[in-house]
Amino acid sequence: FEQLLSVPKKGQKVIVNRNCHRSILTGLIISGAEPIWVCPNRIEDWSVWGNIDGGKIEELLKQNPDTSMVWITNPTYEGVVSDIKSISNVCKKYGVPLLVDEAHGCLWNFNKHLPETALKLGADAVVHSLHKTGGSMSQSSMLHIAKDSCLDVSAVEKALKLLHTTSPSLMLLASLD
């Protein structure tokens, strides 16, 4: 997450859900980006944060037209799914890339009874933490960038090269296979 969030420049605004993973906070600090917090709906019966809909994102984009990207966690740690399709439509309307932390949804693409992956719903990039639900070793994850993404792929590659080791763990890489 830190790698992708080092793409925004200092002072640029990023809409991010308030219950994001701490690595996203690290990425915001490294990049110097300014978070614009979106609070998910609350599920009082469960005492957990719920979903986010496109209306909340559109409201924030209207208030912050200079936003550089939107970052949403979907699903939450508790398994709550947001309306990624409506969020994606709003982001496309405003020309802002949508990035999704789909850490706990890495296997969704392989079962028709599970929610659709954010890439199919229009996200520009998705991070899958295969060590959480995919069976790979801890610390292993994948970044997927959509073919029609509006992200600057060369900037993402530069950020990855800046922050990644030149000696990656072959055991971790093999466990992703």
What residue ranges belong to the model's regions?
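Conserved PLP-enzyme active-site core in the AAT-like
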Residues: 2-177
